[in-house]
Regions:
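Short amphipathic alpha-helix in the helical subdomain of ABC transporter nucleotide-binding domains
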Residues: 18, 42-46, 95
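Helix-loop "lid/cap" segments that line or gate small-molecule binding pockets
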Residues: 4-5, 25-40, 98, 129-130
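Active-site neighborhood of HAD-like aspartate-dependent phosphohydrolases
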Residues: 1-20, 34
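Short acidic-hydrophobic, aromatic-tinged amphipathic segments that line or gate anion-handling sites
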Residues: 180-184
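Substrate-recognition "cap/lid" segment bordering the active-site pocket of phosphatases
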Residues: 63-65, 85, 91-143, 147-156, ...
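Metal-dependent phosphoesterase signature
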Residues: 33-71, 80
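Substrate-recognition element of Asp-dependent hydrolases with the DxDx(T/V) motif
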Residues: 1, 70-100
């Protein structure tokens, strides 16, 4: 984010300010980080960030590893017939690149992205995901690492799980209303599959 701001002559935002916006679409992050700037300046920052991101992808210098235990969890969920979906603040192109890199593109029945729906915590992405797969709120769980994920789930009327190994800590996720806090993939698996959670 700092490089994108610098590329258009703006002072870089504080790291804690950037962290507080993670989970939101990029344009919304920039608007929150630079509220007094003209829309044209914010648009240039968004473009600079995306260019840098896709350059890092092209040259394979971005590191987005799966968290420990997540691949096995996805296998276990699929084996039980759980329908998987994604609702993310990323744009579709960025999400697909990430999923392709990990061989996960075909594992999700629905993929909702920030370039096709209102920003979290608006429930539109989650509502569209449920509609696409024929799910109901009572049979849906929103799992996320940001308070915006939890708030979106609450706004859609679904149960929510905060994973504490990502962007927000346990206290922040609990304050947002998470129904369960998972400290690791094993705890998440146990809660979802009913194997002791």
């Amino acid at each position: 984010m700092s490089a994108a701001f610098a590329a258009v002559g703006e002072a870089p935002p504080r790291p804690d300010a950037v962290r507080a916006t993670i989970g939101l679409p990029l344009a919304e992050c920039v608007r929150l980080l630079l509220p007094a700037a003209a829309e044209s300046a914010r648009s240039r920052i968004v473009a600079a960030y995306r260019e840098a991101f896709f350059d890092m992808r092209r040259f394979e210098t971005v590191d987005e590893p799966l968290f420990p235990g997540v691949a096995a969890l996805l296998d276990a969920l699929e084996a039980r017939g759980v329908v998987l979906g994604i609702a993310t603040g990323k744009i579709e192109r960025a999400l697909n690149l990430t999923l392709e890199r990990h061989g996960l593109l075909g594992r999700f029945a629905t993929r909702q992205t920030a370039d096709k729906a209102p920003a979290k915590p608006d429930p539109a992405m989650l509502n569209r995901a449920m509609a696409e797969v024929g799910a109901t709120p009572v049979r849906t769980v929103m799992i996320g690492d940001s308070v915006y994920d939890i708030l979106m789930g609450k706004n859609a009327g679904v149960r929510t799980v905060g994973v504490v190994w990502g962007q927000n800590n346990a206290d922040e996720l609990a304050a947002a209303g998470a129904d369960f806090l998972a400290r690791d993939a094993a705890a998440l698996s146990a809660w979802i599959l009913g194997d002791g959670g």
